[in-house]
Protein backbone atom coordinates (compact mmCIF):
# COMPACT_ATOMS: atom_id res chain seq x y z
CA UNK A 1 0.00 0.00 0.00
CA UNK A 2 2.70 2.40 1.01
CA UNK A 3 4.91 1.42 -1.95
CA UNK A 4 2.07 2.11 -4.44
CA UNK A 5 1.48 5.53 -2.91
CA UNK A 6 5.17 6.26 -2.97
CA UNK A 7 5.45 5.27 -6.63
CA UNK A 8 2.43 7.34 -7.58
CA UNK A 9 3.50 10.46 -5.66
CA UNK A 10 7.11 9.99 -6.77
CA UNK A 11 6.20 9.95 -10.46
CA UNK A 12 4.01 13.04 -10.01
CA UNK A 13 6.66 15.02 -8.16
CA UNK A 14 9.38 13.90 -10.54
CA UNK A 15 7.42 15.34 -13.41
CA UNK A 16 6.94 18.66 -11.58
CA UNK A 17 10.67 18.93 -10.76
CA UNK A 18 11.60 18.12 -14.39
CA UNK A 19 9.21 20.86 -15.53
CA UNK A 20 10.83 23.30 -13.10
CA UNK A 21 14.32 22.36 -14.30
CA UNK A 22 13.19 22.59 -17.95
CA UNK A 23 11.79 26.06 -17.29
CA UNK A 24 15.05 27.04 -15.68
CA UNK A 25 16.98 25.76 -18.68
CA UNK A 26 14.67 27.62 -21.09
CA UNK A 27 15.07 30.83 -19.10
CA UNK A 28 18.83 30.35 -19.13
CA UNK A 29 18.81 29.87 -22.92
CA UNK A 30 16.65 32.95 -23.42
CA UNK A 31 18.63 35.22 -21.12
CA UNK A 32 22.23 34.09 -21.23
CA UNK A 33 23.48 37.50 -20.20
CA UNK A 34 21.25 37.54 -17.07
CA UNK A 35 22.52 34.07 -16.07
CA UNK A 36 26.06 35.14 -16.44
CA UNK A 37 25.43 38.16 -14.25
CA UNK A 38 23.69 36.40 -11.32
CA UNK A 39 24.77 32.78 -11.65
CA UNK A 40 22.01 31.77 -9.16
CA UNK A 41 21.72 28.04 -8.39
CA UNK A 42 18.86 26.52 -6.30
CA UNK A 43 20.39 24.50 -3.50
CA UNK A 44 17.99 25.04 -0.54
CA UNK A 45 15.10 22.55 -0.13
CA UNK A 46 12.11 22.54 2.25
CA UNK A 47 10.28 19.43 3.49
CA UNK A 48 6.65 20.27 4.36
CA UNK A 49 3.65 18.49 5.98
CA UNK A 50 5.68 16.65 8.62
CA UNK A 51 3.84 15.28 11.72
CA UNK A 52 3.43 17.89 14.51
CA UNK A 53 4.74 15.47 17.14
CA UNK A 54 7.94 14.80 15.16
CA UNK A 55 11.21 16.07 16.67
CA UNK A 56 14.44 17.13 15.01
CA UNK A 57 16.34 14.02 16.10
CA UNK A 58 13.59 11.71 14.83
CA UNK A 59 13.57 13.52 11.48
CA UNK A 60 17.33 13.14 11.13
CA UNK A 61 16.99 9.43 11.85
CA UNK A 62 14.37 9.11 9.10
CA UNK A 63 16.42 11.14 6.59
CA UNK A 64 19.82 9.52 7.27
CA UNK A 65 22.02 8.98 5.39
CA UNK A 66 21.87 12.50 3.97
CA UNK A 67 24.15 13.90 1.26
CA UNK A 68 26.60 16.60 2.27
CA UNK A 69 24.87 19.80 3.44
CA UNK A 70 25.90 22.99 5.18
CA UNK A 71 22.54 24.09 6.62
CA UNK A 72 19.79 22.15 8.43
CA UNK A 73 16.96 23.89 10.33
CA UNK A 74 13.83 22.29 11.85
CA UNK A 75 10.66 24.22 12.80
CA UNK A 76 8.00 22.45 14.95
CA UNK A 77 4.25 22.89 14.41
CA UNK A 78 2.59 26.16 15.44
CA UNK A 79 -0.36 25.36 17.76
CA UNK A 80 -2.14 28.59 16.83
CA UNK A 81 -2.68 27.30 13.27
CA UNK A 82 -4.98 24.43 14.35
CA UNK A 83 -6.11 22.25 12.53
CA UNK A 84 -3.28 22.84 10.06
CA UNK A 85 -0.57 21.61 12.36
CA UNK A 86 2.51 20.54 10.42
CA UNK A 87 6.25 20.69 11.03
CA UNK A 88 8.82 21.62 8.38
CA UNK A 89 12.57 21.44 7.78
CA UNK A 90 15.02 23.39 5.58
CA UNK A 91 18.19 21.76 4.09
CA UNK A 92 20.84 23.43 1.96
CA UNK A 93 22.84 20.90 -0.07
CA UNK A 94 26.38 21.59 -1.19
CA UNK A 95 26.00 19.63 -4.43
CA UNK A 96 22.88 20.58 -6.46
CA UNK A 97 22.86 17.12 -8.09
CA UNK A 98 22.01 15.57 -4.70
CA UNK A 99 18.68 17.46 -4.69
CA UNK A 100 17.19 15.14 -7.36
CA UNK A 101 18.24 12.03 -5.44
CA UNK A 102 16.78 13.45 -2.21
CA UNK A 103 13.57 14.47 -3.99
CA UNK A 104 13.09 11.03 -5.55
CA UNK A 105 13.53 9.42 -2.16
CA UNK A 106 11.49 11.61 0.22
CA UNK A 107 8.90 13.42 -1.92
CA UNK A 108 5.63 11.66 -0.97
CA UNK A 109 7.33 9.73 1.82
CA UNK A 110 4.68 8.83 4.44
CA UNK A 111 5.55 9.68 8.09
CA UNK A 112 3.53 8.00 10.86
CA UNK A 113 3.18 9.73 14.25
CA UNK A 114 2.73 8.11 17.69
CA UNK A 115 -1.09 8.00 17.24
CA UNK A 116 -0.82 6.05 13.98
CA UNK A 117 -1.84 8.91 11.66
CA UNK A 118 -0.15 9.16 8.27
CA UNK A 119 1.48 12.36 6.99
CA UNK A 120 2.84 12.26 3.33
CA UNK A 121 5.77 14.70 3.05
CA UNK A 122 6.27 17.25 0.25
CA UNK A 123 9.78 18.23 -1.00
CA UNK A 124 10.10 21.65 -2.69
CA UNK A 125 12.65 24.34 -3.40
CA UNK A 126 12.65 26.91 -0.61
CA UNK A 127 11.14 30.27 -1.65
CA UNK A 128 14.15 32.04 -0.10
CA UNK A 129 17.42 30.50 -1.13
CA UNK A 130 19.64 32.57 1.13
CA UNK A 131 21.15 30.84 4.13
CA UNK A 132 21.56 32.68 7.44
CA UNK A 133 25.16 32.90 8.40
CA UNK A 134 26.17 31.96 11.92
CA UNK A 135 27.75 34.78 13.87
CA UNK A 136 31.15 33.93 15.19
CA UNK A 137 31.78 35.03 18.79
CA UNK A 138 34.93 36.97 19.50
CA UNK A 139 37.41 35.25 21.74
CA UNK A 140 37.87 36.92 25.12
CA UNK A 141 41.43 38.12 25.56
CA UNK A 142 41.27 37.68 29.38
CA UNK A 143 40.08 34.09 29.27
CA UNK A 144 42.37 31.93 31.48
CA UNK A 145 44.28 34.87 32.94
CA UNK A 146 42.57 35.10 36.41
CA UNK A 147 45.70 34.07 38.26
CA UNK A 148 47.55 37.02 36.78
CA UNK A 149 44.83 39.51 37.82
CA UNK A 150 46.09 41.87 40.61
CA UNK A 151 42.66 42.16 42.27
CA UNK A 152 42.40 38.39 42.55
CA UNK A 153 45.88 38.25 44.11
CA UNK A 154 44.89 40.95 46.65
CA UNK A 155 41.77 38.96 47.53
CA UNK A 156 43.89 35.86 48.15
CA UNK A 157 46.19 37.82 50.47
CA UNK A 158 43.25 39.22 52.50
CA UNK A 159 41.67 35.80 52.71
CA UNK A 160 44.86 34.28 54.09
CA UNK A 161 45.10 37.11 56.67
CA UNK A 162 41.50 36.47 57.77
CA UNK A 163 42.33 32.82 58.32
CA UNK A 164 45.23 33.81 60.53
CA UNK A 165 43.02 36.21 62.50
CA UNK A 166 40.38 33.54 63.02
CA UNK A 167 42.97 31.54 64.90
CA UNK A 168 43.52 34.50 67.29
CA UNK A 169 41.52 35.41 70.47
CA UNK A 170 37.75 35.85 69.73
CA UNK A 171 37.49 38.77 72.17
CA UNK A 172 39.96 40.83 70.16
CA UNK A 173 38.10 39.97 66.99
CA UNK A 174 34.82 41.06 68.57
CA UNK A 175 36.37 44.37 69.62
CA UNK A 176 37.68 44.96 66.12
CA UNK A 177 34.28 44.19 64.60
CA UNK A 178 32.54 46.60 67.00
CA UNK A 179 35.08 49.31 66.20
CA UNK A 180 34.50 48.84 62.50
CA UNK A 181 30.72 48.98 62.91
CA UNK A 182 31.05 52.14 64.99
CA UNK A 183 33.14 53.74 62.33
CA UNK A 184 30.62 52.81 59.67
CA UNK A 185 27.74 54.17 61.73
CA UNK A 186 29.63 57.39 62.44
CA UNK A 187 30.22 57.83 58.77
CA UNK A 188 26.54 57.31 57.95
CA UNK A 189 24.98 59.43 60.74
CA UNK A 190 24.45 63.20 61.05
CA UNK A 191 23.29 65.43 63.95
CA UNK A 192 19.77 65.54 62.53
CA UNK A 193 19.60 61.75 62.29
CA UNK A 194 20.92 61.48 65.84
CA UNK A 195 18.23 63.90 67.06
CA UNK A 196 15.47 61.96 65.29
CA UNK A 197 16.80 58.70 66.70
CA UNK A 198 16.89 60.11 70.24
CA UNK A 199 13.34 61.42 69.84
CA UNK A 200 12.13 57.98 68.78
CA UNK A 201 13.89 56.36 71.70
CA UNK A 202 12.35 58.89 74.10
CA UNK A 203 8.84 58.29 72.74
CA UNK A 204 9.35 54.55 72.98
CA UNK A 205 10.52 54.89 76.59
CA UNK A 206 7.48 57.05 77.50
CA UNK A 207 5.17 54.55 75.81
CA UNK A 208 6.69 51.68 77.75
CA UNK A 209 6.39 53.61 81.03
CA UNK A 210 2.70 54.32 80.34
CA UNK A 211 2.13 50.69 79.49
CA UNK A 212 3.79 49.62 82.75
CA UNK A 213 1.74 52.16 84.72
CA UNK A 214 -1.47 50.93 83.13
CA UNK A 215 -0.57 47.33 83.87
CA UNK A 216 0.24 48.24 87.47
CA UNK A 217 -3.11 50.04 87.91
CA UNK A 218 -4.99 47.09 86.47
CA UNK A 219 -3.20 44.73 88.83
CA UNK A 220 -4.00 47.04 91.77
CA UNK A 221 -7.69 47.19 90.80
CA UNK A 222 -7.79 43.45 90.42
CA UNK A 223 -6.19 43.00 93.82
CA UNK A 224 -8.71 45.39 95.40
CA UNK A 225 -11.61 43.54 93.79
CA UNK A 226 -10.26 40.25 95.07
CA UNK A 227 -9.87 41.75 98.54
CA UNK A 228 -13.46 43.06 98.50
CA UNK A 229 -14.76 39.70 97.37
CA UNK A 230 -12.80 37.98 100.11
CA UNK A 231 -14.13 40.39 102.75
CA UNK A 232 -17.66 39.92 101.47
CA UNK A 233 -17.28 36.17 101.66
CA UNK A 234 -15.92 36.47 105.20
CA UNK A 235 -18.87 38.65 106.24
CA UNK A 236 -21.35 36.24 104.68
CA UNK A 237 -19.63 33.35 106.42
CA UNK A 238 -19.76 35.18 109.77
CA UNK A 239 -23.44 36.03 109.25
CA UNK A 240 -24.17 32.44 108.37
CA UNK A 241 -22.37 31.23 111.49
CA UNK A 242 -24.23 33.73 113.67
CA UNK A 243 -27.56 32.69 112.14
CA UNK A 244 -26.75 29.05 112.81
CA UNK A 245 -25.81 29.89 116.39
CA UNK A 246 -29.03 31.86 116.87
CA UNK A 247 -31.01 28.98 115.44
CA UNK A 248 -29.33 26.49 117.75
CA UNK A 249 -29.89 28.75 120.78
CA UNK A 250 -33.54 29.26 119.85
CA UNK A 251 -33.97 25.52 119.55
CA UNK A 252 -32.37 24.95 122.95
CA UNK A 253 -33.87 27.88 124.87
CA UNK A 254 -37.39 28.98 123.92
CA UNK A 255 -38.02 32.59 124.88
CA UNK A 256 -41.47 33.53 126.18
CA UNK A 257 -42.78 37.00 125.34
CA UNK A 258 -45.65 38.51 127.37
CA UNK A 259 -47.98 40.75 125.42
CA UNK A 260 -50.74 43.04 126.80
CA UNK A 261 -54.39 42.13 126.29
CA UNK A 262 -55.99 45.20 124.79
CA UNK A 263 -59.48 44.06 123.91
CA UNK A 264 -62.25 42.28 125.64
CA UNK A 265 -61.90 39.29 123.36
CA UNK A 266 -58.23 39.13 124.24
CA UNK A 267 -59.17 39.12 127.95
CA UNK A 268 -61.55 36.25 127.31
CA UNK A 269 -58.85 34.36 125.43
CA UNK A 270 -56.34 35.03 128.19
CA UNK A 271 -58.80 33.80 130.83
CA UNK A 272 -59.40 30.70 128.76
CA UNK A 273 -55.69 30.16 128.40
CA UNK A 274 -55.20 30.70 132.15
CA UNK A 275 -57.87 28.13 132.89
CA UNK A 276 -56.17 25.71 130.57
CA UNK A 277 -52.84 26.52 132.16
CA UNK A 278 -54.25 25.95 135.67
CA UNK A 279 -55.77 22.66 134.64
CA UNK A 280 -52.47 21.71 133.04
CA UNK A 281 -50.62 22.64 136.23
CA UNK A 282 -53.04 20.64 138.37
CA UNK A 283 -52.55 17.67 136.09
CA UNK A 284 -48.83 18.20 136.26
CA UNK A 285 -48.92 18.37 140.07
CA UNK A 286 -51.12 15.30 140.12
CA UNK A 287 -48.61 13.41 138.03
CA UNK A 288 -45.60 14.92 139.79
CA UNK A 289 -46.72 13.98 143.32
CA UNK A 290 -46.38 10.25 142.88
CA UNK A 291 -43.60 10.77 140.35
CA UNK A 292 -40.84 11.15 142.87
CA UNK A 293 -39.54 7.79 141.84
CA UNK A 294 -39.72 8.48 138.05
CA UNK A 295 -36.73 9.46 136.04
CA UNK A 296 -35.65 13.04 135.26
CA UNK A 297 -36.15 12.32 131.56
CA UNK A 298 -39.97 12.25 131.94
CA UNK A 299 -39.92 15.59 133.73
CA UNK A 300 -37.89 17.15 130.91
CA UNK A 301 -40.30 15.81 128.29
CA UNK A 302 -43.30 17.18 130.21
CA UNK A 303 -41.63 20.57 130.56
CA UNK A 304 -40.85 20.78 126.86
CA UNK A 305 -44.43 19.73 126.04
CA UNK A 306 -45.80 22.47 128.29
CA UNK A 307 -43.54 25.05 126.74
CA UNK A 308 -44.69 24.04 123.27
CA UNK A 309 -48.35 24.31 124.33
CA UNK A 310 -47.71 27.72 125.82
CA UNK A 311 -46.02 28.89 122.62
CA UNK A 312 -48.98 27.71 120.57
CA UNK A 313 -51.42 29.55 122.85
CA UNK A 314 -49.37 32.74 122.70
CA UNK A 315 -49.14 32.52 118.90
CA UNK A 316 -52.91 32.07 118.65
CA UNK A 317 -53.51 35.08 120.91
CA UNK A 318 -51.04 37.15 118.92
CA UNK A 319 -52.74 36.31 115.63
CA UNK A 320 -56.15 37.19 117.11
CA UNK A 321 -54.88 40.56 118.36
CA UNK A 322 -53.33 41.36 114.98
CA UNK A 323 -56.61 40.53 113.29
CA UNK A 324 -58.54 42.84 115.65
CA UNK A 325 -56.05 45.65 115.12
CA UNK A 326 -56.38 45.31 111.35
CA UNK A 327 -60.19 45.38 111.61
CA UNK A 328 -60.08 48.56 113.73
CA UNK A 329 -57.70 50.24 111.30
CA UNK A 330 -59.96 49.40 108.38
CA UNK A 331 -63.00 50.78 110.22
CA UNK A 332 -61.11 53.98 111.00
CA UNK A 333 -60.06 54.39 107.37
CA UNK A 334 -63.61 53.78 106.20
CA UNK A 335 -65.02 56.42 108.54
CA UNK A 336 -62.38 58.94 107.46
CA UNK A 337 -63.25 58.26 103.82
CA UNK A 338 -66.98 58.78 104.50
CA UNK A 339 -66.28 62.05 106.30
CA UNK A 340 -64.11 63.38 103.47
CA UNK A 341 -66.68 62.38 100.87
CA UNK A 342 -69.51 64.11 102.80
CA UNK A 343 -67.41 67.24 103.07
CA UNK A 344 -66.68 67.17 99.33
CA UNK A 345 -70.37 66.72 98.45
CA UNK A 346 -71.34 69.58 100.78
CA UNK A 347 -68.91 71.92 99.05
CA UNK A 348 -70.12 70.80 95.65
CA UNK A 349 -73.75 71.47 96.57
CA UNK A 350 -72.83 74.91 97.90
CA UNK A 351 -71.18 75.81 94.61
CA UNK A 352 -74.10 74.35 92.66
CA UNK A 353 -77.21 75.48 94.59
CA UNK A 354 -75.89 78.32 96.72
CA UNK A 355 -74.79 78.59 100.31
CA UNK A 356 -78.32 79.02 101.75
CA UNK A 357 -79.51 75.73 100.29
CA UNK A 358 -77.06 73.69 102.32
CA UNK A 359 -77.95 75.58 105.55
CA UNK A 360 -81.70 75.05 104.96
CA UNK A 361 -81.07 71.42 104.21
CA UNK A 362 -79.05 71.04 107.40
CA UNK A 363 -81.89 72.56 109.43
CA UNK A 364 -84.39 70.22 107.82
CA UNK A 365 -82.14 67.31 108.56
CA UNK A 366 -82.01 68.36 112.21
CA UNK A 367 -85.83 68.70 112.61
CA UNK A 368 -87.49 66.50 110.01
CA UNK A 369 -84.84 64.38 108.31
CA UNK A 370 -84.03 60.74 108.68
CA UNK A 371 -81.67 58.46 106.77
CA UNK A 372 -82.68 55.42 104.89
CA UNK A 373 -81.18 52.84 102.53
CA UNK A 374 -82.06 52.37 98.84
CA UNK A 375 -84.95 50.10 99.83
CA UNK A 376 -86.82 53.09 101.33
CA UNK A 377 -86.11 55.40 98.36
CA UNK A 378 -89.35 54.46 96.64
CA UNK A 379 -91.34 56.23 99.37
CA UNK A 380 -90.50 59.66 97.92
CA UNK A 381 -93.43 61.35 96.29
CA UNK A 382 -93.58 61.65 92.56
CA UNK A 383 -94.23 65.38 92.80
CA UNK A 384 -91.25 65.97 95.08
CA UNK A 385 -88.92 64.21 92.66
CA UNK A 386 -90.27 66.25 89.73
CA UNK A 387 -89.79 69.50 91.68
CA UNK A 388 -86.23 68.59 92.59
CA UNK A 389 -85.42 67.64 88.97
CA UNK A 390 -86.92 70.87 87.58
CA UNK A 391 -84.96 72.92 90.13
CA UNK A 392 -81.70 71.21 89.17
CA UNK A 393 -82.37 71.79 85.47
CA UNK A 394 -82.98 75.49 86.16
CA UNK A 395 -79.92 76.16 88.26
CA UNK A 396 -77.13 73.84 87.06
CA UNK A 397 -74.81 74.60 84.16
CA UNK A 398 -76.13 72.72 81.12
CA UNK A 399 -72.72 72.61 79.45
CA UNK A 400 -71.41 70.51 82.32
CA UNK A 401 -72.82 66.98 82.60
CA UNK A 402 -74.59 66.10 85.79
CA UNK A 403 -72.61 63.94 88.22
CA UNK A 404 -74.39 61.16 90.01
CA UNK A 405 -74.16 61.76 93.75
CA UNK A 406 -72.60 59.01 95.73
CA UNK A 407 -72.98 58.76 99.49
CA UNK A 408 -71.44 55.99 101.54
CA UNK A 409 -73.31 53.68 103.87
CA UNK A 410 -74.97 55.01 106.96
CA UNK A 411 -72.93 55.12 110.15
CA UNK A 412 -74.00 53.59 113.48
CA UNK A 413 -76.17 56.34 114.87
CA UNK A 414 -79.75 57.10 115.82
CA UNK A 415 -81.82 59.80 114.19
CA UNK A 416 -85.16 61.23 115.16
CA UNK A 417 -87.94 61.17 112.55
CA UNK A 418 -90.75 63.68 111.93
CA UNK A 419 -93.19 61.53 113.94
CA UNK A 420 -90.87 61.39 117.00
CA UNK A 421 -89.79 57.91 115.96
CA UNK A 422 -86.29 56.62 116.37
CA UNK A 423 -84.68 54.49 113.67
CA UNK A 424 -81.86 52.32 114.94
CA UNK A 425 -79.58 51.05 112.21
CA UNK A 426 -77.44 48.05 112.96
CA UNK A 427 -73.68 48.43 112.53
CA UNK A 428 -72.43 47.74 109.03
CA UNK A 429 -70.00 44.88 108.78
CA UNK A 430 -66.95 45.12 106.48
CA UNK A 431 -68.56 42.62 104.15
CA UNK A 432 -71.51 44.99 103.49
CA UNK A 433 -69.38 48.13 103.33
CA UNK A 434 -69.84 48.28 99.56
CA UNK A 435 -73.60 48.84 99.83
CA UNK A 436 -74.65 52.45 99.14
CA UNK A 437 -77.18 54.28 101.33
CA UNK A 438 -78.65 57.64 100.61
CA UNK A 439 -79.96 60.44 102.79
CA UNK A 440 -83.19 62.15 101.84
CA UNK A 441 -85.01 64.98 103.51
CA UNK A 442 -88.79 64.80 103.59
CA UNK A 443 -90.80 67.75 104.78
CA UNK A 444 -94.40 68.81 104.83
CA UNK A 445 -96.14 70.31 101.84
CA UNK A 446 -96.12 73.78 103.40
CA UNK A 447 -92.36 73.63 103.96
CA UNK A 448 -91.82 72.61 100.33
CA UNK A 449 -93.90 75.50 99.08
CA UNK A 450 -91.99 77.88 101.37
CA UNK A 451 -88.66 76.67 99.98
CA UNK A 452 -89.89 77.14 96.43
From Swiss-Prot:
Pfam families found in the cross-reference section: Smg4_UPF3 (PF03467)
Which subcellular locations apply to this protein? Nucleus; Cytoplasm
As for family, the record states: Belongs to the RENT3 family.
Q: What is the name listed in the Swiss-Prot or TrEMBL entry for this protein? A: Regulator of nonsense transcripts 3A
Q: What is the lineage of its organism?
A: Eukaryota, Metazoa, Chordata, Craniata, Vertebrata
Q: Which residues form a coiled coil?
A: none
Q: Which SUPFAM superfamilies match?
A: RNA-binding domain, RBD (SSF54928)
**Any idea which UniProt keywords this protein has?**
Cytoplasm, mRNA transport, Nonsense-mediated mRNA decay, Nucleus, RNA-binding, Transport
**Which purpose does this protein serve, as stated in its record?**
Involved in nonsense-mediated decay (NMD) of mRNAs containing premature stop codons by associating with the nuclear exon junction complex (EJC) and serving as link between the EJC core and NMD machinery. Recruits UPF2 at the cytoplasmic side of the nuclear envelope and the subsequent formation of an UPF1-UPF2-UPF3 surveillance complex (including UPF1 bound to release factors at the stalled ribosome) is believed to activate NMD. Binds spliced mRNA upstream of exon-exon junctions.
Q: What's a single GO MF annotation on this record?
A: RNA binding
Q: Which InterPro entries would you find in this protein's record?
A: Nucleotide-bd_a/b_plait_sf, RBD_domain_sf, Upf3, UPF3_dom
Q: Does the keyword Cell division apply?
A: no
Knockout consequences: Morpholino knockdown results in a weakly abnormal brain patterning during development that does not affect embryo viability at 5 days post-fertilization.
Species whose genome carries this gene: Danio rerio
- Note the Gene3D superfamilies from the entry: 3.30.70.330
Q: Where is the composition biased (Basic and acidic residues)?
A: 205-363, 376-401
Output the superkingdom of the source species: Eukaryota
The terms describing its cellular component in GO are:
cytoplasm; nucleolus; protein-containing complex
Region annotation (Disordered) maps to: 205-452
Q: Which GO terms describe its biological process?
A: mRNA transport; nuclear-transcribed mRNA catabolic process, nonsense-mediated decay; positive regulation of translation
Amino acid sequence: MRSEKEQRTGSRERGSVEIQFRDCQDNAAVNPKHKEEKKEIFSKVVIRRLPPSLSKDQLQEHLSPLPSFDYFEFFPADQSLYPHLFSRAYINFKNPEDIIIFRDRFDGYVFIDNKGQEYPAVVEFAPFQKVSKKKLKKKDAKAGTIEEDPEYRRFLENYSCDEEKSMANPETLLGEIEAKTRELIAKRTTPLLEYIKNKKLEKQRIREEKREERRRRELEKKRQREEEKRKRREEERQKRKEAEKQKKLSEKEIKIKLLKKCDRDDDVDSDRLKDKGDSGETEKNRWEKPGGHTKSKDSKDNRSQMENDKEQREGHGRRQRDKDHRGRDEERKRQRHHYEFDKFMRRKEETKWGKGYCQDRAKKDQHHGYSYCPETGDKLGKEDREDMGSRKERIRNKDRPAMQLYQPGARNRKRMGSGNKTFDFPPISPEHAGEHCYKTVIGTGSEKSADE
